[in-house]
UniProtKB/Swiss-Prot annotation:
Stored Pfam families: TBD
GO cellular component, one term: cytoplasm
Molecular function terms from GO: zinc ion binding
UniProt source species: Homo sapiens
Keyword Ribonucleoprotein appears in the UniProt entry: no
Zinc finger (UBZ1-type): 583-609
GO biological process: defense response to virus; type I interferon-mediated signaling pathway
PROSITE patterns, sorted: ZF_UBZ1 (PS51905)
The organism's taxonomic lineage, starting at the top: Eukaryota, Metazoa, Chordata, Craniata, Vertebrata
Keywords tagged on the record: Coiled coil, Host-virus interaction, Immunity, Innate immunity, Metal-binding, Phosphoprotein, Zinc, Zinc-finger
Record's keyword annotation contains Transport: no
Protein name per Swiss-Prot or TrEMBL: TANK-binding kinase 1-binding protein 1
Highest rank taxon of the organism: Eukaryota
Quaternary context: Homodimer. May form a heterodimer with NAP1. Interacts with TKB1 and IKBKE. Weakly interacts with DDX3X. (Microbial infection) Interacts with vaccinia virus protein C6.
Tissues expressed in: Detected in leukocytes, lung, placenta, small intestine, liver, kidney, spleen, muscle, heart, brain and at low levels in thymus.
């Protein structure tokens, strides 16, 4: 085969040779004749055609053999003499797909065979039980046949005895007839009792066969012998009837056992089918019940969260209205009319309002200012600051969420703002009687606000988590650890901002400020200090429990979005309840707690309710 492929067999025509080459046997050659040239050329062409046909057939056979060889090597990989496995890179993908298809088909066939094997095992078990029952029936049948043979032998014995007795009776009758021969001619001799079947049939026929038909019976037989023979015959007939009844009972028992066996087989098949269907239905029912329970729990949780969001929004509106009313009433009680209605910041003197005093220049601050319902002049009710006073005022001012930057003789938080208008310290007015103290003043008498803020830096409320834009950078609560549900002790500077963010004064105060309704006379500006707010100032209590409410305007909303932890609605509810009373209560179970009760324990109590309400 290789020699045929290696040989280059080709016949060129004269045109394919070229102009310089000539045929050796061409007609132009004088050495050879024309007939010989044409004959040799035709023979070569014929041989070439035959060889081409043979080569084509061999190539087709070779391709077919190669395909078969590749298929066989895929199914049964062969190893060459050198220990290397034959691989065909051109058919790797097809081989892999064929192997996968064959693997899947073989796996299916294996599963089918296993299923059939299991069925065959069950059928073998059933067949074994049937064989055991059949063997029992066969044993019982053989026992019955043995008993029947014994009874037949007994009946035959009794029949022989009866025949012997009949012969004896006939002999006695013959002797008696010989004695009375002179009275009557001799009777014919009786045939011997050799036919036992006749007597057996007579016995099985019942007692209807009377003794009157017996041959040779004469009334001269003694009554005693006749009675004895009749009793023996009746006993044999009774035994035969008993054997017949026992045979019928055993046949009925055999038929009953066969019927019970068939019934047991049918009930077992029905039980197998019903048990499988019952298991499937129980699984479907259990899965459906679980899905219904999950859907109901999710619906209840969604409704409860909606109610909690509505309650928190209602509490926020009530608290804002209450704080606005408190701020208005406190400003009217603790500030003179001239200072409250002054549109520009000025420094009033301790003299009466009729006496004019030179106005002080406004307090200067390097940071942006925010409008406030009170002027930036200090009052005796404010705390001291290391900076020099800019505009002292003898009149107590209304408390605001942002502390002013002017100095007063009262305690005030420190601020690096330079003094702008120093003034003599006036005498503070007498405080109002205790009965006239407002609700906000009673709230200011509570413990410092940093304790409240540190106690309520726990989990976020569900209503705040629903606003995904405000907490885009925060991780979802279900991905946090279990310890994240408890309050985390943090420094005051990192309560509203992360450890890597700068604490700018404007962002610090815009995130927690309160927005009061603008009065026509409140056109002054509040100076925002450059230092962070102190946790001891009384005015920050307002902002500490109002920071959880979303502020609708864009600057405050932007600052609110930078907060890492927002207060949850239980903290707002508890702080609102502590404003008017000395007893705080759980918003979920209405359990009362004293004011001195630790905030961490109270938050754990509320978190226990929230954890129990989860699915």
């Amino acid at each position: 085969m290789e020699s045929m492929f290696e040989d280059d067999i080709s016949i060129l025509t004269q045109e394919a040779l070229g102009p310089s080459e000539v045929w050796l046997d061409s007609p132009g050659d004088p050495s050879l004749g024309g007939d010989m040239c044409s004959a040799s050329h035709f023979a070569l062409i014929t041989a070439y055609g035959d060889i081409k046909e043979r080569l084509g057939g061999l190539e087709r056979e070779n391709a077919t053999l190669r395909r078969r060889l590749k298929v066989y090597e895929i199914k049964y990989p062969l190893i060459s003499d050198f220990g290397e496995e034959h691989g065909f890179s051109l058919y790797e993908i097809k081989d892999g797909s064929l192997l996968e298809v064959e693997k899947v088909s073989l796996q299916q066939r294996l599963n089918q065979f296993q299923h059939e094997l299991q069925k065959n095992k069950e059928q073998e078990e059933q067949l074994g039980e049937m064989i055991q029952a059949y063997e029992k029936l066969c044993v019982e049948k053989s026992d019955l046949e043995t008993e029947l043979r014994e009874m037949r032998a007994l009946v035959e014995t009794h029949l022989r005895q009866i025949c012997g007795l009949e012969q004896q009776l006939r002999q006695q009758q013959g002797l008696q007839d010989a004695a009375f021969s002179n009275l009557s001619p001799p009777p014919a001799p009786a045939p011997p009792c050799t036919d036992l079947d006749l007597h057996y049939l007579a016995l099985r026929g019942g007692s209807g066969l009377s003794h009157a038909g017996w041959p040779g019976s004469t009334p001269s037989v003694s009554d005693l012998e006749r009675r004895r023979l009749e009793e023996a015959l009746e006993a044999a007939q009774g035994e035969a009837r008993g054997a017949q009844l026992r045979e019928e009972q055993l046949q009925a028992e055999c038929e009953r056992l066969q019927g019970e066996l068939k019934q047991l087989q049918e009930t077992r098949a029905q039980d197998l089918a019903s048990n499988q269907s019952e298991r499937d239905m129980a699984w479907v029912k259990r899965v459906g019940d679980d899905q219904v329970n999950l859907a109901l729990a999710y619906t209840e949780l969604t409704e409860e969260l909606g109610r909690l969001r509505e309650l928190s929004s209602l509490q926020g509106r009530i608290l804002r209205t209450l704080l606005q009313e408190q701020a208005r009433s406190g400003g009217q009680r603790h500030s003179p009319l001239s200072q409250r209605h002054s549109p520009a910041p000025q420094c009033p003197s301790p003299s009466p309002p009729a006496r004019a005093a030179p106005p002080c220049p406004p307090c200067q601050s390097p940071v942006p200012q925010r409008r406030s319902p009170v002027p930036p002049c200090p009052s005796p009710q404010q705390r001291r600051s290391p900076a020099s006073p800019s505009c002292p005022s003898p009149v107590p001012q209304r408390r605001s969420p942002v502390p002013p930057s002017c100095q007063s003789p009262s305690p005030q938080r420190r601020s690096p703002v330079p003094p702008s208008c120093p003034a003599p310290q006036p005498r503070p007015p007498p405080p109002p009687p205790p009965g006239e103290r407002t609700l906000a003043e009673r709230a200011y008498a509570k413990p410092p606000s940093h304790h409240v803020k540190a106690g309520f830096q726990g989990r976020r409320s569900y209503s705040e988590l629903a606003e995904g834009a405000a907490y885009a950078g925060a991780s979802p609560p279900w991905l946090q650890a279990e310890a994240a549900t408890l309050p985390k002790p943090r420094a005051y500077g990192s309560e509203l901002y992360g450890p890597g963010r700068p604490l700018s004064p404007r962002r610090a105060f815009e995130g927690i400020r309160l927005r009061f309704e603008k009065q026509p006379s409140e056109e002054d500006e509040w100076a925002v200090p450059t230092s962070p707010p102190s946790p001891e100032v009384g005015t920050i209590r307002c902002a500490s429990f109002c920071a959880g409410f979303p502020i609708p305007e864009s600057p405050a909303a932007t600052a609110y979005a930078h907060a890492e932890h927002a207060q949850s609605w239980p903290s707002i509810n508890l702080l609102m309840e502590t404003v008017g009373s000395d007893i705080r209560s759980c918003p979920l179970c209405q359990l009362g707690f004293p004011v001195g009760y630790p905030d961490d324990a109270l938050i754990k109590h509320i978190d226990s309710h929230l954890e129990n309400s989860k699915i």
